[in-house]
Amino acid sequence: MTRPGPSDPEDLPPSWAGMAPMNAVHHRSTGYSDRYWRAESLAAKRRGGQRWGIPSAAAVLALNLAGFLALPWMIDTDSSPAYVLAIMIPSVLAASLAFVITARRGNGPAVDFGLPATLSEWGAQLRSGIAWGAAALAGGLLIAVLVLARTDLEDRSPLGNLIGIPLPWKVALVGWIWIGAPFCEEVMFRGMLWGALERRTAPMRMSWLGNRWVVLVVTAVVFALWHREGWRFLVLVWGGFAIGIARMRTGSVVASTTAHSVNNTLPALAILSLAE
């Protein structure tokens, strides 16, 4: 005799549903937003089929780092096209590897990276990304002013080595900094690294790494260190934190990519103002 009830495991209620409530998070009436619950449900959905973790995330980051270290020795970066391509290629390769890993050993990019499935989800994620991107940009400008006021630097601009690039390549670089780099970096940091840490739950060793706030802080710090720009470290940590909030609230790299793009708006536009 077949027991009545849903046969699809995804339709079953949470394991704690039949128990007395132990804390407020078990209730949708506690004031958490719909985006919060969607992020929670996406995280739970990912864990079932996710067979990649910290080693896979480390491989993606290692490929990115190896590309940035090796390409200057392999191509002539004094050439404008080669220089621009040298900036793009390592991140494109790393993001491509991330997509391969999620397709072969995970649930696929749509689930593992929380890609929106409906227009309403797209809208919600874009709105969250714009809001937190604006916070990242405003806070970053304030921190930069405070840091530069107390720091004696000969070259305070990370764009100084871009002077002399012809306009067509500047436009290509603007598009990369504004859209391409945010997408690739979010796949690496708030996609792979975030997902690898997020799946560490009890009884796994070092399950504390799966705490959402630990994940947020770790990804923000690694993101800042990865850019290797000393005086901008605090600016980048704040940016990573604000961008990560967009990821945490929505469960999607679309929101964090949008926030990252908003945060990169001024640097992208600044490139066009550089003398040829």
For each of these PLM feature ranges, what is it?
Residues I75-A86, A110-A181, R199, P203-M204:
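Juxtamembrane helix-loop-helix connectors linking adjacent transmembrane helices
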Residues I165-E276:
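Transmembrane helix-loop-helix hairpins at the membrane interface
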Residues A57, L61, L65, M88, ...:
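Alpha-helical transmembrane spans of integral membrane proteins, capturing the lipid-embedded, hydrophobic core
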Residues G49-A57, S80-M88, E121-G129, W169-V174, ...:
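Residue-level signature of transmembrane alpha-helical entry/exit and packing/kink sites
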